[in-house]
């Protein structure tokens, strides 16, 4: 991560008026005397920016706009479906950030005017900013699937956001009779957490083996290849041979879902295959969060950014990070969002203090739980070369790995999640 600015230097650069202001509980209307940073989205990325910007720039007014008082992360959600973690383990609030002087508005951003540098809220209020961070996560491209809309997702939950969708899928699985079929449909294209559909199949199978052993999982994949492919395929045979039935496209989108009947719990693939399940979870193709699209920050489905700072290339004084950002070759993941957020916090602090920026150092690691003590991982470090984000080095679990190494990976996974939540939501340091 880039070097942090010295607090004394930053305060001096802001001037006496900013230095004299207090940190806590400042109403939005009274914070005009010092720079204001507004963060749209209070998930892992947005919360991390607030936490690290507060450390680097204690005299800046920081406001998070997030409608949920408590955020349930998508990271770790498969462990909940597998019965290894509770939904409370995945749910976090903003108490610690508030205690550090970060203002959190329980509201939704409905429009961004990048020329006037303001954000309009659902409540009707308009918030001005000097710097804006957009971290709204993902939205879904539902138009590609006939019959699939928000109402259909209540019957066929994608559970690709935390919270209600996640608990809905869990409840459907628990209510299913032993012997029922769970259908999981994985999308093509860029989407949140590339290995997650396959970990999800493993974790649901882990639950079913204990509680509904006559049931099965039908995993349909629109892609001809995917992350950790050999590792997951081995796990399907080793741990869930008679439970997970995997259907993989031979060509792109061959088995993409093109039509659903949510009430009948049926889906149809592009190849003409018609399938029916007791529980059906269709994960649609994805795009940047709706507010980023409405603000004109996208090029196609995602938001182009300067890889050195994650500054939007579409609007001045705006940064986009996390799932909505076009940050290849980094995956869209909680780890990546946390890493990118620290780069954004440093870049904003440097801009406001008129101080030099440092080359970013980014990392991402992804663990996947195959069974209770069997976890695999992959990851990489990233930097900027010739104006592009590039992978500097990488690692991945080997196909043949000692049992003790896999058990150690499991411990790492659980420890990482706890530590990252503390790091993101200001519970430590």
Question: Where do the PLM segments sit?
Answer:
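N-terminal secretory signal peptides and thylakoid transit peptides that target proteins
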Residues: 1-18
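A Rossmann-like FAD-binding core segment of flavoenzymes
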Residues: 102-112, 119, 127, 206-301, ...
């Amino acid at each position: 991560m880039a070097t942090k600015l010295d607090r004394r230097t930053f305060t001096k650069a802001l001037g006496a008026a900013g230095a004299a202001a207090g940190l806590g509980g400042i109403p939005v209307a009274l914070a005009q005397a010092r720079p204001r940073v507004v963060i749209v989205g209070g998930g892992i990325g947005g919360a991390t920016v607030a936490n690290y910007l507060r450390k680097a720039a204690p005299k800046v007014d920081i406001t998070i706009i997030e409608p949920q008082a408590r955020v349930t992360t998508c990271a770790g959600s498969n462990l909940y479906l597998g019965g290894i973690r509770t939904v409370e383990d995945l749910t976090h609030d903003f108490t610690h950030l508030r205690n550090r002087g970060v203002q959190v508005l329980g509201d939704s951003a409905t429009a961004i005017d990048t020329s006037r540098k303001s954000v309009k809220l659902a409540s009707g209020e308009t918030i001005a900013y000097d710097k804006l961070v957009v971290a709204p996560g993902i939205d879904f491209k539902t138009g590609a699937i006939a019959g699939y809309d928000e109402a259909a997702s209540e019957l066929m939950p994608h559970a690709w956001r935390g919270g209600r969708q996640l608990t809905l899928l869990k409840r459907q699985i628990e209510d299913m009779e032993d012997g029922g079929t769970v259908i999981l449909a994985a999308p093509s294209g860029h989407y949140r957490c590339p290995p997650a559909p396959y970990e999800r199949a493993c974790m649901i199978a882990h639950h079913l083996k204990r509680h509904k052993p006559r049931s099965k999982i039908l995993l349909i994949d629109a892609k001809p290849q995917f992350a950790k492919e050999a590792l997951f395929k081995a796990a399907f045979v080793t741990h869930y041979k008679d439970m997970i039935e995997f259907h993989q496209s031979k060509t792109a989108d061959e088995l993409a879902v093109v039509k659903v009947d949510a009430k009948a719990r049926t889906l149809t693939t592009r190849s003409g295959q018609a399938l029916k399940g007791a529980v059906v979870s269709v994960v649609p193709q994805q795009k940047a969060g709706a507010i980023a699209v409405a603000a004109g920050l996208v090029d196609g489905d995602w938001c182009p950014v300067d890889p050195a700072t994650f500054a939007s290339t579409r609007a001045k004084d705006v940064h986009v990070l996390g799932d909505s950002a076009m940050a290849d070759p980094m995956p869209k993941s909680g780890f990546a969002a946390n890493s990118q957020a620290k780069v954004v916090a440093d870049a904003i602090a440097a801009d406001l203090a008129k101080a030099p920026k440092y080359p970013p150092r980014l990392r991402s690691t992804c663990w996947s739980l195959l069974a209770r003590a069997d976890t695999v991982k992959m990851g990489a470090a990233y930097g900027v070369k010739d104006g592009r984000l590039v992978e500097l080095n990488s690692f991945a679990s080997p196909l043949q790995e000692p049992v003790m190494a896999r058990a150690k990976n499991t411990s790492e996974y659980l420890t990482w999640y706890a530590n990252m939540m503390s790091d993101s939501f200001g519970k430590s340091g």
